[in-house]
């Protein structure tokens, strides 16, 4: 198993996690919005759940999958339908599975597979109808119940989904995916305490379930339990979740659940911004505005931010103990001296974004001239940075 476990029925349905909404802007040193707002609706992707997915079954030998089915045994047709389902050929699988059921309406495995195929196609009403009918006569079919629950969640029928999940968990308490999805459903119903309980049960059995830890942190944040939320955000951030890195930075920027530390805030926001989290970039931009005096903050705030950016730049050297610094040169310059242009460019961008004027000038020169044999002129990474810097008034505009 990997160092972190990802639960895949639902991908972080809370709006901040899925990108459906963004938090309020984050970034003066004294006032940073860190409380996520519950979305009016939860966007959930229509992806087949992990546990009910059928095994890959090769159909019995035949000249073609499209061979006539009229004379075939229902069990053979079921195997063919499952094989098509495993290959992602949902329309064909649906037709084949319906034929199996025409020949043998009591073939429970075919009806369960048909429900999964319909769900994967996005035909939620038909999937729910098939699976409910099946479970009325075969309530023991756990995978069919989990598929039904997933379809109900996708349809945002929270009470019905909750009932199916709780039934499944009563029979099999070790179903981590069902427990995780129950947390999603309870959150959607406004039951924050129940959602917290569900996510904690997942983590008690699988501490590496990083999505569950992040969702737990979000719900704790909504419940105004910062002292519990921040450690969960930090754990998810350290596991590599970009949105968690944003919230970790926000916690350090405001002192929510941890001592206030602008250097740590800058470090976490930088990591999140490099992975496309817009609120993190907004937070850094507002800190830069504060340091420049444009944000009309008190002089003490401006000085604190300037010092934090300087300390952040100094700590970047800790990752390169083999490099000897010459004077006040940027870390990126030292890397360039060693012919390590590939490493130098992202480091220079970090340093320039942290208000290093020498790094900024080096990037402008590198963009215009490049380095023969190492870095061509007009590097796209540098251009992207220079455009963002120009938008903040820290660089001349580029075409």
Which functions belong to the PLM regions below?
Residues 72, 106, 140, 174, ...:
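Short helix-capping/linker turns of helical repeat alpha-solenoids
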Residues 83, 117-118, 151-152, 185-186, ...:
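Hydrophobic face of amphipathic alpha-helices that form TPR/SEL1-like repeat modules
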Residues 76, 110, 144, 178, ...:
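TPR alpha-solenoid repeat register
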Residues 70-103, 116, 120, 150, ...:
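Alpha-helical segment of the N-proximal tetratricopeptide repeat
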């Amino acid at each position: 198993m990997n160092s972190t476990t990802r639960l895949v029925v639902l991908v972080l349905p809370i709006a901040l996690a899925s990108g459906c909404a963004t938090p309020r802007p984050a970034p003066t040193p004294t006032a940073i919005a860190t409380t996520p707002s519950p979305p009016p609706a939860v966007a959930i992707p229509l992806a087949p759940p992990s546990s009910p997915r059928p095994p890959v079954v090769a159909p019995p030998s035949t000249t073609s999958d499209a061979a006539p089915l009229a004379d075939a045994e229902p069990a053979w047709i079921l195997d063919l339908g499952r094989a098509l389902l495993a290959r992602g050929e949902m329309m064909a699988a649906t037709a084949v599975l319906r034929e199996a059921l025409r020949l043998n309406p009591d073939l429970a495995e075919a009806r369960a597979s048909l429900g999964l195929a319909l769900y994967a196609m996005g035909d939620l009403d038909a999937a729910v109808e098939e699976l409910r009918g099946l479970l009325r006569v075969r309530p023991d079919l756990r995978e069919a119940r989990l598929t039904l629950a997933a379809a109900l969640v996708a349809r945002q029928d929270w009470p019905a989904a909750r009932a199916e999940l709780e039934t499944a968990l009563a029979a099999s308490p070790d179903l981590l995916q069902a427990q995780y999805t129950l947390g999603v459903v309870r959150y959607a119903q406004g039951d924050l305490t129940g959602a917290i309980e569900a996510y904690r049960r997942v983590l008690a059995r699988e501490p590496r379930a990083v999505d569950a830890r992040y969702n737990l942190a979000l719900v704790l944040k909504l419940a105004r339990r910062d002292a519990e939320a921040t450690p969960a955000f930090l754990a998810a951030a350290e596991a590599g979740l970009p949105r968690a890195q944003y919230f970790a930075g926000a916690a350090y920027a405001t002192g929510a659940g941890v001592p206030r530390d602008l250097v740590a805030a800058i470090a976490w926001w930088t990591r999140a911004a490099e992975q496309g989290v817009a609120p993190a970039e907004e937070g850094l931009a507002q800190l830069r505005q504060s340091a420049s005096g444009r944000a009309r903050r008190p002089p003490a705030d401006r000085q604190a931010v300037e010092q934090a950016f300087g300390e952040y730049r100094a700590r970047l050297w800790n990752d390169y103990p083999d490099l000897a610094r010459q004077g006040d040169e940027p870390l990126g310059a030292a890397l360039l001296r060693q012919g390590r242009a590939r490493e130098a460019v992202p480091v220079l961008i970090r340093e320039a974004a942290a208000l290093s004027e020498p790094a900024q000038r080096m990037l402008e020169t590198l963009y215009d001239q490049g380095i023969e044999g190492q870095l061509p002129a007009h590097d796209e990474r540098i251009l992207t940075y220079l455009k963002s810097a120009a938008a903040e008034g820290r660089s001349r505009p580029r075409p």
